[in-house]
């Protein structure tokens, strides 16, 4: 999108089941991991999509293992909730070749479980967290679960 409001509007008007835009990493590592991209612009894209279509399911993903600190990762998750991102995927960085960035840390299954619990506690409607999780991981089920939760919330509001 590179900040193009027209491009985002075209996608939103196509009424996708989910709008996915991965932030990929924490702000401190953004230039190294995503050259040419900007963390704030990625967050703004998700926020603008939400304003254009409040019912649109939004999703983002973070790959871990680039050298981020735990607190930086939690802040990135909080930043995504601040723009009302619905679904979060968290997966391990796996270096495709020696020409790519090295792996700085392998996260344990327990750490991925803790991140999932923290994300759910922050209010994400669905969190996938594990070493092999990618943004497409169980995508249809994620969309259906978020839709059910939203519909349930509307039903509860109507009963009040």
Residue ranges of model-derived segments:
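Canonical radical SAM enzyme core domain
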Residues: 1-11, 25, 64-72
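Active-site-adjacent beta->alpha loops and helix N-cap segments on the catalytic face
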Residues: 4, 29, 33-43
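Auxiliary Fe-S-binding modules of radical SAM enzymes
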Residues: 13-14, 37-57, 62-160
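Short, acidic/turn-prone active-site loops that include or flank metal/cofactor-
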Residues: 24-26, 93
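Alpha-helix N-cap/helix-start and coil->helix boundary motif
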Residues: 26-27, 134
């Amino acid at each position: 999108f590179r900040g193009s409001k027209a491009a985002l509007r075209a996608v939103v008007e196509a009424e996708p089941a989910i709008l996915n835009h991965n932030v990929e990493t924490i702000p401190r590592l953004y230039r190294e991991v995503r050259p040419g991209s900007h963390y704030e612009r990625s967050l703004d894209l998700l926020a603008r999509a939400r304003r254009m279509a409040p019912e649109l399911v939004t999703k983002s993903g973070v790959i871990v293992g680039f050298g981020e600190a735990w607190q930086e990762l939690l802040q990135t998750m909080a930043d995504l909730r601040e723009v009302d991102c619905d679904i979060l995927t968290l997966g391990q960085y796996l270096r495709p070749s020696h020409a790519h960035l090295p792996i700085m840390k392998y996260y344990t299954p327990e750490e991925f479980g803790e991140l999932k619990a923290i994300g759910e506690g922050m209010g994400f409607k669905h969190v996938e967290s594990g070493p092999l999780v990618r943004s497409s991981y169980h995508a249809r089920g994620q969309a259906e679960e978020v839709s059910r939760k939203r519909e349930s919330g509307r039903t509860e509001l109507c009963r009040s």
